[in-house]
Design a protein with these regions (language model features):
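C-terminal motif of bacterial Sec signal peptides marking the signal peptidase cleavage site
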Residues: 18-21
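Compact beta-sheet-dominated domain cores in extracellular/mature segments
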Residues: 23-146
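Alpha-helical transmembrane segments
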Residues: 13-16
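Bacterial N-terminal signal peptides that target proteins for export
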Residues: 1-11
């Protein structure tokens, strides 16, 4: 019975993030992955992680481990920590797949992730650093395939 309540809690938390406009932070990675994907800050499933069980149109809206500092025209700086351009590896739940996109709103270069994990996005061709998909994802769609 515990497995069912964990799955329900994860789905409920993802729904709140998507539909309630409360997209502060994604749920942490579950010990047993049964839905969606888990994105990791570093290669080989290291660093901070987050469970993604529903589509996210803009990873910049989700608080995460990567910090971006911006300056306005008056020289004022601000920083924002998010998951935008931050994923370096992905674990996929059995029966699920995902597409990670270079730009928000599911646009730009796309990296399809099947039922096999990606241990290092530096080994996946893409438009970002050194022509790879490392630290490149800005939106993600997840799909149940069975």
């Amino acid at each position: 019975m515990r497995r069912r309540s964990t799955r329900t809690a994860t789905i409920f938390a993802s729904a709140l993030l998507l539909f309630d406009g409360c997209r502060d932070k994604l749920p942490v990675a579950p010990s047993e992955l049964t839905t969606g994907i888990v994105i990791y800050q570093h290669a080989n499933f290291l660093g901070e992680s987050a469970h993604v069980a529903a589509d996210i149109s803009n990873l910049d809206d989700v608080r995460g481990p990567c910090v971006r500092t911006e300056s306005d025209s008056e020289g004022n700086t601000s920083s924002k920590d998010s998951w935008d351009d931050c994923a370096s590896s992905v674990r996929v739940a059995p029966g699920w797949r995902a597409t990670l996109y270079e730009d928000p709103n599911y646009k730009g270069w796309a990296a399809d992730v099947g039922e096999e994990n990606v241990t290092n996005f530096q080994l996946v061709r893409g438009p970002c650093s050194r022509d790879t998909f490392n630290d490149c994802a800005s939106s993600v769609r997840v799909f149940r395939v069975r």
